[in-house]
Amino acid sequence: MTQEFEHLSVLLTETVAGLNIKPDGIYIDGTFGRGGHSRKVLEELGPNGRLIAIDRDPQAIAAAEQFKDDSRFQIVHGGFGQLADYVEDLGLKGKIDGVLLDFGVSSPQLDDAERGFSFLRDGPLDMRMDNSQGQTAAQWLARAEIEDMAWVFKTYGEEKNSRHIARCIAADREKAPFLRTKELADLIARITKNKERNKHPATRVFQAIRIYINSELEQIDQALEGALTVLAPEGRLSVISFHSLEDRMVKRFIRRNSQGESVPHGLPITEEEINKSRKLKGVGKAIKPSAEEIERNARARSSVLRIAQRLPYEA
């Protein structure tokens, strides 16, 4: 029997509003999760609209059964980093009216101890988004070099004590391998001296391992670039980030593609030619959840929504 976990989509109204839904438009939900954003998009689409959802989590694919009778909807089992490939296979490159990306780990993934994402619930050290393939967190921790662990913790978790934690993990695994989330979380809590207020000492390390195991930042980079190639002129991009690494990537991506190509000083190039190379324009300011939403859903606290619009292609 499958245990059900509630999931509240973050910034739901704002994110879908950012897509500026056309009744007959074609949209991508690159991170289906449990279908909250997809449901909202479908509510706003007309009978001739279309929604293509993507997710690499087999449990998310199973959850998509809720829309099996809706002919406007289809689900693709795969990573959002490959969204451009999926769209090209469907013959829809340059015809997508909006792309929605939500980089958060869903509540069902966090709440299901068997998935191994949470340091608050004891379970196997897995952390794979697609638990049918790839190495688990336990397998990586069992053989990673101290230098590699320290680099992952610092780069993907912005963990200040990365080297100390890596050394302690290496020392402890000599006695017994880390197989459970609680074993790793307890070790980090035990060796961390300067604890951050209202934050579990293992937060950054768990985030770092999850990002590394799932190649999340590479997937994000590919998804953003892919969205640029599939969007129709005036198509919208709505992106929700949950930590500073993700948000910096999104912010820089929008800024870079809004400014156009950088030209070496002195080159005879007109403003019109520079404008032609601009591919996006930001829409409004970054949006954060209201106090009311955070009260309803504490996991929304760190979320940030950024919206951009595709400019016409170069002539």
Curated annotation (Swiss-Prot):
The EC number(s) this enzyme carries: 2.1.1.199
Top-rank taxon: Bacteria
Keywords, ordered alphabetically: Cytoplasm, Methyltransferase, rRNA processing, S-adenosyl-L-methionine, Transferase
Annotated Gene3D superfamilies: Putative methyltransferase TM0872, insert domain, Vaccinia Virus protein VP39
GO molecular function: rRNA (cytosine-N4-)-methyltransferase activity
GO cellular component: cytoplasm
Major site of localization recorded for this protein: cytoplasm
Class of this enzyme: transferase
Pfam families the UniProt entry points to: Methyltransf_5
Family, similarity comment: Belongs to the methyltransferase superfamily. RsmH family.
UniProt xrefs under PANTHER family: 12S RRNA N4-METHYLCYTIDINE METHYLTRANSFERASE, S-ADENOSYL-METHYLTRANSFERASE MRAW
Protein function: Specifically methylates the N4 position of cytidine in position 1402 (C1402) of 16S rRNA.
Name of this chain's protein: Ribosomal RNA small subunit methyltransferase H
Species per Swiss-Prot/TrEMBL record: Shewanella halifaxensis (strain HAW-EB4)
